[in-house]
């Protein structure tokens, strides 16, 4: 029998600020908030509902690719997805449930080492915790025990395999170059095969402990071709390439490939459609069966055994040197650069990690019955910060001292969590120590160092920076890792005073902000007083925050002084650092007297911490900018409308005698007509006559408003109409309204994005079955949205 298994490794490096657990706006991901959001739209979401097209490029099916392949998602990525893309997250979980029914009880999903640490380079305890956390995270999300765990970069050694076997993992997926030699079970002679290993079978690996684990080696050349050639340019080509690999033998053959999951849609646009078509084609091929590794292993246990190449991986020719040395592996995009910084960076991290181990063992012994057991179980609190979960955790692990001082106990565990996050593999993968991935892992180191300082009073940062100074940058103005840390990491630190002030500014700029939540903190009390004058605003008072992560609680006094639209002075001080009543009275006196410069100077002197707006999280700055722009838009709209209404009759007269239309008027006209069209399409019922009149004006003035905001508004309306149809597909009026809207969109040349509308209508028509083919209006609707009936 012939089998096919396609594995997708879905992972993104963590991008959250180490203090806030939130991702800052990333302009390079525009028009999305950040790269996670962009990649989700391009890959994770489309693969949950992938399109299959016929020869006419009409839609014939929508199916979850996840439900028919083997896959893993990084736990840190799933954590983000659960909060920010809940529909996609649920689709991933549901796909695994569906796949268990398809593949004999074996789900397509497998676990992953928690934060993509290179396990052969990790110390023994980190190996264990990374595997335990990855498994526990999987169990919590998928509701079952995983059969396997994906190793970051497939980096492997015998010690790592022992940890996997200890945790009951049945198999591991490796690159063919990671195979050292094979032999038939029961035979004595080994065959040195290396990368020439036959990838069409499972292999048994006998470990020194006496335990065993199965090995699958993916097809290297085909996997590489899929990732870096045009194989995915069509589903037919993809399927043909995979189906051409089988030989004529009668034994079970497993064609298996493994690539980054982001290949399907992000790295290669529309590749999720090629994957969907390929899977459908394979399902229709009589002698080939889709499978996942767990099912194949159960049906066809290994008859060969294999040994691995120690300290090997899929992305470094030199084993695992890419994550600790200047081995020559890099992106290839910066000829002449070196990676001599990799070794010193790892040494710097190892140095602070070892000091934090001492802290954890000495101080931790006062707070936990067994600190390392507590760390292994800390994943339960990471996944559930509720009071009930904390109570259960403390019942199991806490000493009496921990019960009386929970914040310190939790800070110890958070220190260890960040001390592992700082080894995320992406920090070494690329070319330069100032790259965002490397800055990110330094940020985790900074957070861990800060927690160690709070717990012990000992500051590890000077020694860490001294070690980082030995890590050379390729950029002259940066020189070394210490300069990178100083420039890019330190400004990202978020003391609780700054978190409080950012929350106050957010509330002033955006009424939709949750007043009870400031990033990872609860707002227990917020008692502001506000004073306003033309061009000035002063907000001051008390605020109390409590960290959900560490339970650390802080009451603070604050003042936010605003001059003009976007000039903010923000200051805060812990309770007890000032005579609050005297300070607040002085602020009131100065502001009431119009002594605004003195008011600002007094704030700088009276409060412990001062922060300009420019130092704050970019999302907060954007809230202020958005508020300013909204006010500007309102004023602009009013002025442009006055200009348009007053001058349009004159302009029409000028056109009649062949005179050119003044450019300033055209600017005003485009603004006004765009706003009016948006308003029409966002109304509950579109007034077609009004749209026709507006478009006549657009045509008369030679404007083009078919793109941008108007197109977006048309797309929104189309999607809403399609959703209404999907909820009640037998309602002829819904179908008619949708067809008429599509006709008008064609007439006016709006070209809306039909992706979501097509999905809704497809499922609506599918619910009607054969009846959909019998009604003219439904056939017309299908034609308009290119859906095959």
Regions found by a protein language model. Name each.
Residues 63, 81-85, 177-179, 183-197, ...:
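Extended, Lys/Arg-enriched charged tracts that mediate electrostatic binding to polyanionic substrates
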Residues 127-151, 243-256:
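CE4/NodB-like, metal-dependent polysaccharide N-deacetylase domain
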Residues 650-789:
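Extended alpha-helical scaffold segments
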Residues 3-8, 13-125, 129-130, 147-151, ...:
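Short, well-structured secondary-structure segments
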Residues 442-452, 472-477, 569-571, 699, ...:
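Eukaryote-specific, cytoplasm-facing alpha-helical/coiled-coil scaffolding segments in long proteins
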Residues 1-55, 76, 190-508, 534, ...:
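Active-site and substrate-binding clefts of carbohydrate-active enzymes
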Residues 90-103, 107-108, 132, 144, ...:
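Acidic, His- and aromatic-enriched active-site or binding-groove loops in soluble protein domains
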Residues 116, 145-156, 260-264, 434-439:
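Conserved short loop/turn motifs at secondary-structure junctions
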């Amino acid at each position: 029998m012939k089998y096919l298994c396609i594995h997708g490794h879905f992972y993104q490096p963590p991008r959250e600020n180490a203090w806030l657990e939130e991702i800052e706006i990333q302009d390079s991901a525009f028009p999305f908030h950040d790269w996670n959001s962009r990649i989700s739209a391009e890959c994770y979401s489309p693969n949950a509902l992938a399109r299959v097209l016929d020869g006419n490029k009409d839609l014939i099916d929508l199916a979850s690719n996840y439900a028919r392949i083997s896959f893993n998602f990084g736990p840190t990525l799933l954590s983000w997805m659960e909060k920010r893309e809940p529909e996609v997250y649920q689709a991933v979980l549901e796909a695994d449930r569906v796949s268990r029914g398809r593949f004999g009880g074996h789900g397509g999903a497998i676990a992953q080492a928690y934060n993509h640490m290179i396990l052969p380079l990790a110390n023994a305890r980190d190996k264990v915790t990374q595997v335990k956390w990855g498994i526990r995270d999987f169990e919590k999300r998928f509701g079952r025990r995983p059969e396997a765990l994906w190793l970051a970069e497939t980096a492997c050694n015998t010690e790592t395999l022992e940890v996997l076997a200890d945790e009951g993992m049945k198999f591991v997926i490796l690159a063919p170059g990671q195979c050292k030699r094979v032999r038939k079970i029961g035979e004595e002679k080994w065959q040195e095969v290396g990368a020439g290993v036959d990838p069409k079978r499972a292999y048994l690996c006998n470990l020194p402990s006496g335990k065993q684990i199965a090995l699958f080696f993916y097809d290297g050349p085909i996997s590489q071709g899929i990732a870096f050639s045009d194989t995915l340019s069509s589903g037919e080509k993809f399927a043909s390439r995979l189906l051409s690999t089988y030989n004529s033998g009668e034994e079970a053959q497993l064609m298996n490939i493994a690539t980054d999951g982001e290949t399907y849609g992000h790295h290669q646009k529309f590749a999720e459609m090629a994957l969907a078509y390929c899977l459908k084609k394979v399902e229709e091929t009589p002698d080939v069966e889709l499978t996942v590794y767990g099912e194949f292993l159960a049906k066809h246990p290994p008859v060969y055994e294999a040994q691995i190449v120690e300290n090997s991986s899929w992305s470094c020719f030199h084993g695992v040197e890419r994550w600790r040395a200047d081995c020559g592996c890099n992106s290839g995009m910066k000829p002449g650069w070196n990676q001599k910084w990799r070794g010193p960076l790892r040494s710097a991290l190892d140095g602070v990690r070892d000091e934090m181990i001492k802290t954890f063992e000495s101080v931790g012994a006062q707070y936990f019955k067994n600190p390392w057991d507590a760390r292994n179980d800390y994943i339960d609190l990471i996944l559930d910060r509720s009071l009930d979960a904390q109570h259960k955790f403390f019942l199991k692990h806490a000493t009496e001292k921990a019960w009386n001082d929970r914040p310190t106990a939790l800070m110890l565990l958070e220190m260890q969590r960040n001390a592992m996050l700082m080894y995320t593999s992406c920090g070494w993968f690329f070319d330069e120590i100032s790259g965002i991935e490397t800055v990110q892992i330094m940020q985790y180191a900074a957070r861990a160092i800060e927690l160690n300082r709070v717990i012990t009073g000992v500051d590890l940062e000077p020694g860490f920076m001294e070690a980082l100074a030995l890590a050379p940058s390729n950029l002259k103005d940066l020189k070394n890792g210490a300069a990178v840390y100083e420039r890019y990491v330190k400004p990202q630190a978020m003391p609780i005073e700054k978190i409080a002030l950012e929350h106050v500014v957010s509330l002033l700029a955006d009424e939709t902000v949750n007043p009870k939540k400031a990033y990872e903190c609860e707002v227990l009390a917020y008692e502001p007083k506000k004073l306003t004058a033309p061009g000035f605003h002063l907000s001051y008072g008390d605020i109390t925050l409590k960290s959900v992560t560490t339970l650390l609680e802080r009451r603070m006094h604050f003042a936010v002084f605003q001059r003009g639209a976007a000039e903010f002075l923000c200051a805060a001080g812990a309770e007890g650092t000032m005579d609050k009543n005297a300070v607040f009275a002085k602020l009131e006196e100065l502001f009431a007297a119009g002594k605004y410069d003195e008011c600002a100077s007094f704030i700088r002197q009276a409060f412990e911490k001062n922060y300009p707006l420019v130092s704050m999280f970019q999302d907060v700055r954007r809230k202020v900018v958005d508020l300013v722009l909204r006010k500007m838009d309102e004023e602009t709209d009013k002025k442009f409308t006055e200009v348009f209404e007053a001058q349009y009759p004159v302009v029409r007269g000028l056109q009649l005698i062949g005179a050119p239309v003044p450019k300033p008027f055209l600017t005003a006209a485009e603004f006004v007509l765009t706003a009016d069209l948006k308003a029409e399409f966002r109304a509950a019922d579109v007034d077609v006559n009004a749209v026709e009149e507006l478009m006549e004006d657009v045509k008369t003035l030679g404007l083009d408003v078919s793109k941008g905001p108007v197109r977006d508004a048309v797309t929104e309306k189309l999607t809403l109409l399609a959703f209404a149809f999907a909820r009640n597909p037998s309602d002829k009026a819904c179908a008619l309204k949708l067809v008429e809207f599509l006709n008008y969109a064609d007439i006016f040349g709006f070209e809306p994005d039909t992706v979501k509308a097509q999905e809704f209508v497809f499922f609506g028509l599918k619910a009607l079955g054969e009846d959909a083919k019998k009604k003219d209006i439904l056939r017309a609707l299908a034609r308009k949205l290119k859906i095959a009936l």
